[in-house]
Swiss-Prot record:
One of its GO terms (molecular function) is single-stranded DNA binding. Residues 6-111 form the SSB domain. It comes from Klebsiella pneumoniae subsp. pneumoniae (strain ATCC 700721 / MGH 78578). Residues 55-61 bind DNA. This is Single-stranded DNA-binding protein 1. Plays an important role in DNA replication, recombination and repair. Binds to ssDNA and to an array of partner proteins to recruit them to their sites of action during DNA metabolism. Stimulates the ATPase activity of PriA. One tetramer binds to 26 nucleotides (nt) of ssDNA, a 55 nt piece of ssDNA probably binds 2 tetramers. Disulfide bonds: none annotated. The keyword DNA damage applies. Residues 110-174 are annotated as: Disordered.
């Protein structure tokens, strides 16, 4: 098993531009965008804050691509789970070029994070705030998995709704 290796990429970042959605001859959607991830630290020598931003090319396929095209915009924060792929292509002058991308296929995940952008409908499909018994994932929620197209997602049994957590009578002061 160890000889096969693992190719899994997890990113949380912000879109650098609106997704570009195209359709293959087979009818399947493909979305491309760049994702910025940043880290910041304090320079030990000068004490000033430093920041480094990395840009990642992301490619989504199928239903995920359609969802990205409809709901994601420049600046949207998103969680991506996919695989690293390098593809070879030829430019107009005949030179071979290589591009490394994070590919989100059937087994991958894309989850929208943060609040809604602009004045459109909420990405979470009208999630409610607070209240006991609310589902952890909003109804029609904002998590999309590439596998959702080919296999139904298992639902956990429903917990008793509209009841606050049980109040335990114990002597612990916190």
């Amino acid at each position: 098993m160890a000889s096969r290796g693992v190719n899994k990429v997890i990113l949380v970042g912000n879109l650098g531009q609106d997704p570009e959605v195209r359709y293959m001859p087979s009818g399947g959607a493909v979305a491309n965008f760049t994702l910025a991830t940043s880290e910041s630290w304090r320079d030990k020598q000068t004490g000033e804050m430093k920041e480094q931003t990395e840009w990642h090319r992301v490619v989504l396929f199928g239903k995920l691509a359609e969802v990205a095209g409809e709901y994601l915009r420049k600046g949207s924060q998103v969680y991506i789970e996919g695989q690293l792929r390098t593809r070879k292509w030829t430019d107009q002058s005949g030179q071979d070029k290589y591009t490394t991308e994070v590919v989100v296929n059937v087994g991958g995940t894309m989850q929208m994070l943060g609040g809604r952008q602009g004045g459109g409908a909420p990405a979470g499909g009208g999630q409610q705030q607070g209240g006991w018994g609310q589902p952890q994932q909003p109804q029609g929620g904002n998590q999309f998995s590439g596998g959702a197209q080919s296999r139904p997602q298992q639902q956990a049994p429903a917990a008793p709704s509209n009841e606050p957590p049980m109040d335990f009578d114990d002597d612990i002061p916190f």
